[in-house]
Amino acid sequence: THVRDAYNLAIGERTAEDIKIKVGSAVPLKDELDVEVNGRDVITGLPKTVRIESEEIRRALNKPLDEMAKAVKDALDATPPDLASDLMYYGILLTGGGALLRGLDVRLRDETGVSVNVSPTALDNVVNGCARVLEANAFDGGFVQTNA
């Protein structure tokens, strides 16, 4: 949406994801980055290339990142005291592809006051967790069954 609005450039989801991976960040970078983006001019219908800087992508990501930080703070506010103590000791573990956004751990740490770590296997954790659920036959009728 940002690229379309700012540059009248239509791009696909994969291109948008590539932009985020190549230059996206949650905090200012020591050395800002830029990326060349190819797409279709929505006015002329012709191919078009633009150069986009990391600072611009960071501004575009700011609202969803603020919402993420608010969700984390809300979860922390609702956390029972015993678990809150564990969180302060162990910190928050980010996982999944989004965890790899440059500086997301720093931004969440700064906004929550809780240490934040990125899983060294962030990209594999979701699929590995799903595999464990399936291997344990814990998925039944739309719900995960636990041995309570």
Tell me what each language-model feature is.
Residues T1-N62, D77, L87:
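Phosphate-binding glycine-rich/basic clefts of nucleotide- and phosphate-handling proteins
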Residues L9-E17, D31, R132-A148:
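Acidic, glycine/GT-rich loop-and beta-edge segments that sit at the periphery of enzyme/chaperone cores
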Residues R14, E56, K63, E67, ...:
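Conserved active-site and cofactor/substrate-binding residues in soluble primary-metabolism enzymes
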Residues I19, V72, L94, C130:
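Residue-level signature of catalytic and energy-coupling elements of molecular machines
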Residues G24, P28, A84-L108:
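Glycine-rich phosphate-binding loops at beta-strand->alpha-helix junctions
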Residues A60-L87, V133-N137:
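Phosphate/ATP-binding catalytic cores across multiple sugar-kinase/actin-like superfamilies
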Residues V106-A131, D140, T146-N147:
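Conserved phosphate-binding/catalytic loops in two-lobed NTP-binding clefts
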